[in-house]
């Protein structure tokens, strides 16, 4: 019985030591964890580079199909709108012509008759001539008949066509003139460049000749005259007998007379 009590007392007394050792082991194990192992504190790579995602084969095929089909779809849209507008305009023109012909003015039929007769006359006149005359005679006579039947409209159309022809001729003239002036300017520039190069060569030759002549003249002058003779002739030394000493005389205006005046020199002493 006593042995059991002793064992229990020993076990109870050893419990704090066991807990302390277990806690120390846990602390030591927790300290061994590195920051890189934690998911929150992962360090970014030192050298980072942005790499664009390259498209795959399927994406490339879809993009090529889209580009090719887009061009054809655009052309089809343009053709569809052009045909649609033409059909709408032709339908509207037919409606207007039907309304106009349903109730025509009294002078319409005679005018149409004159125009048709003039066109047929042109065809008859040019039936045995060349192809150009077969086309020109009917067109000319029909335009003449239209201008006779509708003079006001003919004048307006003639003015508009004349302005267009004048503008076109002016543009062609300016284009030809610009080309001609460009050629002339190029030839002038070539001639000027040639003349400038020739003048530069002449100036260089003249300057070289002058420089050589100047060097020769300087060398000849140095050999002819010595420095001692030139110094003796230009700057002669004064002789000892002719030297004279002059006394210093101060200016009375610059002297300090104090409270006296220059007239009372005999009465007051002056400071120089």
UniProtKB/Swiss-Prot annotation:
It comes from the Eukaryota. Residues 127-134 are mitochondrial matrix. It is a multi-pass membrane protein. Keywords: Membrane, Mitochondrion, Mitochondrion inner membrane, Transit peptide, Transmembrane, Transmembrane helix. Belongs to the apolipoprotein O/MICOS complex subunit Mic27 family. Component of the MICOS complex, a large protein complex of the mitochondrial inner membrane that plays crucial roles in the maintenance of crista junctions, inner membrane architecture, and formation of contact sites to the outer membrane. PANTHER family: MICOS COMPLEX SUBUNIT MIC26 / MIC27 FAMILY MEMBER. Component of the mitochondrial contact site and cristae organizing system (MICOS) complex (also known as MINOS or MitOS complex). This is MICOS complex subunit MIC27. It comes from Gallus gallus. The gene is APOOL.
């Amino acid at each position: 019985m006593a042995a059991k009590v002793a064992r229990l007392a020993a076990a109870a007394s050893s419990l704090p030591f066991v807990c302390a050792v277990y806690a120390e082991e846990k602390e030591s194990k927790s300290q061994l964890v590195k920051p890189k192992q934690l998911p929150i504190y992962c360090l970014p790579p030192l050298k980072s580079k942005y790499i664009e995602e390259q498209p795959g084969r399927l994406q490339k095929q879809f993009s090529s199909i889209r580009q090719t089909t887009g061009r054809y779809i655009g052309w089809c849209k343009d053709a569809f709108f052009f045909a649609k507008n033409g059909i709408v305009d032709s339908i509207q023109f037919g409606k207007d012509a039907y309304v106009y012909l349903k109730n025509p003015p009294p002078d319409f039929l005679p005018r149409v008759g004159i125009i048709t007769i003039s066109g047929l006359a042109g065809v008859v006149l040019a039936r045995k001539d060349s192809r150009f005359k077969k086309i020109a005679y009917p067109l000319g006579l029909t335009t003449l008949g239209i201008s006779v039947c509708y003079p006001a409209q003919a004048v307006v159309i003639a003015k508009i066509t004349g302005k267009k022809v004048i503008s076109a001729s002016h543009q062609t003239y300016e284009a030809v003139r610009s080309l001609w002036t460009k050629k002339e300017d190029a030839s002038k520039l070539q001639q000027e460049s040639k003349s400038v190069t020739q003048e530069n060569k002449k100036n260089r030759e003249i300057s070289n000749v002058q420089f050589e002549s100047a060097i020769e003249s300087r060398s000849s002058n140095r050999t002819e005259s010595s420095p001692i003779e030139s110094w003796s002739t230009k700057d002669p030394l004064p002789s000892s007998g002719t030297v004279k000493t002059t006394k210093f005389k101060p200016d009375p205006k610059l002297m300090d007379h104090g409270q006296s005046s220059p007239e009372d020199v005999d009465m007051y002493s002056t400071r120089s």
